[in-house]
Regions:
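Short intrinsically disordered, low-complexity coil segments enriched in acidic
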Residues: 1-2, 135
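N-terminal auxiliary segments of SAM/dcSAM-dependent transferases
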Residues: 2-88
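Generic preference for well-ordered secondary structure
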Residues: 13-15, 100, 153
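S-adenosyl-L-methionine
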Residues: 31, 83-118
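Charged, low-complexity, helix/coiled-coil-prone segments
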Residues: 52-63, 104-113, 161
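Phosphate-binding glycine-rich loops and adjacent basic patches that engage nucleotide phosphates
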Residues: 73-82, 102-103, 123-132
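The AdoMet/dcAdoMet-binding core of the Class I SAM-like
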Residues: 107, 111-164
């Protein structure tokens, strides 16, 4: 068993606690093709293929391919060209993140999360301890609620999930 503090992972992988205008390498972007086709994507210009070779990172959608390096320097909300259509590169809001993350664990959705935040009377500056981080759906919303002066401590049993 591996136990880690998830708030560390959230700060390294993505900047959900603050909004930014321009996409940079390492950011998480939501690729919105249509209401039924949304994908979360980490912006890395290159990736290692099955043979161990470094290649251009190309993201495939039902409307064609997107060269991930073309996202760098674009503003969030930009319409991006695919080989057979277009999509939008959106900022990962808590709701979009919950809709696009891989559901390896049971997650809470926005309506339930809103009720939890209301009942706990959370606001900027609050300090929250969460147990059972799982996919990070609740943690993402909690961080956005208590930011910029609050703090979220979240713990979970991760193993391979933490490495993703």
């Amino acid at each position: 068993m591996i136990f880690k503090k998830a708030h560390i992972a959230l700060n390294i992988i993505m900047s959900f606690d603050r909004y930014k205008e321009v996409i940079e390498e390492g950011d998480t972007v939501i690729i919105y093709v249509n209401i039924h086709s949304m994908y979360s994507l980490e912006v890395k210009p290159e990736k290692v293929n099955k043979n161990g070779e470094v290649t251009t990172n190309i993201f495939q959608t039902s409307y064609g391919a997107l060269k991930v390096k073309d996202l760098i320097g674009q503003r969030f909300g930009t319409k991006v060209r695919l080989s057979r259509g277009y999509a939008y590169a959106l900022y990962p809001t808590p709701d979009l993140w919950t809709r696009t993350l891989p559901h390896r664990t049971q997650i809470l959705y926005s309506t339930d999360i809103s009720l939890i935040i209301l009942q706990l009377e959370l606001r900027p500056g609050s300090i929250v301890v969460e147990s059972g981080t799982g996919s990070g759906s609740l943690a993402h919303s909690l961080v956005r609620t208590v930011a910029p002066t609050g703090h979220l401590y979240t713990f979970g049993k991760f193993g391979a999930l933490f490495k993703r």
